[in-house]
Amino acid sequence: MLLLERWTEPLAESNCYLLGEAGRAVVIDPNDPRGPLERLEALGWTPERILLTHEHCDHMAGLEALRNRWPGVWVAATAACSAGLGDTRLNMTRRMEVYLAFRGKPGVSYPPFVCRPADETYEHAWECVW
């Protein structure tokens, strides 16, 4: 049976979606280095695909943690998103502390970081055969 779970990252309150069946999973917007990874392990799911909707840090902060834990996972994103993963201005890590302060969470340390580009890019549509 196909199961869809949502993980809400508590700091920026962004969502990650885990879609899984029979031990396999697709991850959409891995927003946190620990939460989605721990949930995937608890469910016994191995992510085969990660889909990024855009490059902002609150949607990809857990990307490298998942890549390091499951080196065979395949990442798909638009070409613009893929390029933005490696740019602290575009992925918003340079401004995240200010954003969080405006959201009522002042004083939070959020060091800038970058991620490796996507394995596959697309422009308008992505077809996932899974």
Model-derived features with residue positions:
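Conserved beta-strand hairpin/beta-sheet module of binuclear metal-dependent hydrolase folds
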Residues: 1-45
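Active-site HxH/HxHxD metal-binding segment of metal-dependent hydrolases
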Residues: 13, 32-128
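Structural motif
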Residues: 21, 129-130
